[in-house]
Structure formats: structure tokens, C-alpha cells
């Protein structure tokens, strides 16, 4: 199995019994919602303000998630336009009782930076650390 990205995850959560489907695996919408939360954090930070999801593209599911698995969600800006940003996300699970990991889900999100009236606003130039 491959390894997760080297950077810190945007969020890390534990899959709970309330998130299972009829077959006992975690419902597919749960890892997608975790990716949206992580992408939102990254988009808001990059745009220095409010940003909203306008599209989710190319969602791929690779492995099931089970109750008690730890889910690490990685997100990064891959491009920024005048008011839009593309955010690449990956979910990686780790078995609770081992260091075994696997890529669960990946997707690309499009966010728009908006102002206090909900209108598109420019994404500021990228800041250097």
C-alpha cells in the first residue's frame, strides 16, 4: 500500500457507529462530507474569508471505511482564478489498532470566494510564509 501525503491533514476524525450503512460500512456520503469540510478550511484560508462549494468533480472511492477507523483528510489548492479555487482532496484511513493505511476517497472541489452579500469577490494573491 502507498503512504498518505507527507503534509499534515486538514482534519482528522474517527468513523462512528452512527455513520454506517445497511451493510456495516461507513456510508459514502460521510467521507465526502469530511472532504468538503477540509476543502472549505483550505479555501477559506487561501481566500482570506468566506468561500462556498460550487462543484464536486471526479469523486473516486477506493476502499471502505469501518467503524473506529481514523480518517485523515488532506486538501490543497491546485489552482486559483479571479474568484474561484480548485481544491484537491484525499481521504486516508488508518486501522485503529495498527499503522496500516489506505487511500479511501479522492475528489476535486471548486470553491468561490464570496463577500458579505454572497457575491463573488477576488481571491487575493498567494501569500508567502
What is the predicted function of each stretch?
Residues 1-55, 112-129:
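Hot-dog-fold acyl-thioester-processing enzymes
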Residues 2-11, 66-67, 78-129:
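HotDog/MaoC-like acyl-thioester-processing domains
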Residues 56-64:
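Short, charge-patterned binding micro-sites
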Residues 25, 64-65:
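Alpha-helix boundary/capping and short turn/kink residues
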Amino acid at each position: 500500500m502507498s503512504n498518505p501525503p507527507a503534509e499534515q491533514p486538514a482534519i482528522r476524525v474517527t468513523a462512528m457507529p452512527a455513520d454506517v450503512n445497511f451493510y456495516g460500512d461507513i456510508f459514502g456520503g460521510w467521507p465526502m462530507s469530511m472532504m468538503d469540510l477540509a476543502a472549505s478550511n483550505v479555501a477559506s484560508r487561501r481566500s482570506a474569508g468566506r468561500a462556498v462549494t460550487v462543484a464536486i468533480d471526479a469523486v473516486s472511492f477506493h476502499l471502505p471505511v469501518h467503524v473506529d477507523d481514523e480518517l485523515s483528510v488532506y486538501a490543497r489548492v491546485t489552482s486559483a482564478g479571479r474568484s474561484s479555487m480548485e481544491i484537491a482532496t484525499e481521504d486516508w484511513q488508518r486501522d485503529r489498532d495498527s499503522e496500516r493505511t489506505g487511500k479511501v476517497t479522492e475528489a476535486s472541489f471548486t470553491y468561490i470566494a464570496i463577500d458579505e452579500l454572497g457575491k463573488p469577490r477576488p481571491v487575493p494573491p498567494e501569500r508567502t510564509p
